[in-house]
Amino acid sequence: VVRGGNDRWYCERLINEALSELDHHGTGPVHINIPIVENSAVYDCENLPQVRKINRISPDMPSEKWREYAERLSKYKKILVIAGQNNCFSEDDRACVEKFFEKYNCLISVEHMSNLKCKGCLMTYPLSECSMQGMFGELCPDLIISFGNNIASYKLKPMIKAHKEKFVHWQIDTAGRIRDFSDKLTDVFECTPQYFFNCFAENAPQDSKNDMTYYNMWNDDIKML
């Protein structure tokens, strides 16, 4: 039963999780239970509410699909890549992240538990924990790309959720799971981070280049702490 915004988000997520399994590594039916609190023979709703659809993209999809996403990606001016907890990164992994950073207007937000150190990385934890809610407005991205496990930054998630109307959220997950910490997840890329960053770096438009504006916005504020 949807009584408010949180209920709506939760139901949207559950329905997306269920329907996305219809053709996920095989096909088959799904069953969705809907509570009915009273009997009624009347259904007079002419227009159903608009809901969010979460797409799943995998390496076995046509390459044209990935190029379409690369074209969209090149048009974003403020891309926040959030690295959650990870075990380790190989040299090849870091090289792919750096190639991506050079091609797109982004920064890579890391924490100690991210275990990622390479070009484009910023330790954003001090800034997110010290900033007031209103200060995040200028730093708010128009695209979030997240990967890894839990994000330790206590205040970052609430700040992101408070500005969820301003951005799109892509998640990288090797199992294709829906993990919607922003309340705004739109696309799940079922692949490794290395595949994702390498693929988009290679499919970037020829003239695509990080102008460093968004990176410098975060870096300058961090230096002021």
Protein language model features and the residues they cover:
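Phosphate/pyrophosphate-binding active-site segments
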Residues: 162-225
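Conserved thiamine diphosphate
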Residues: 1-27, 202
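Short acidic-hydrophobic, aromatic-tinged amphipathic segments that line or gate anion-handling sites
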Residues: 1-2, 123-132, 186-200
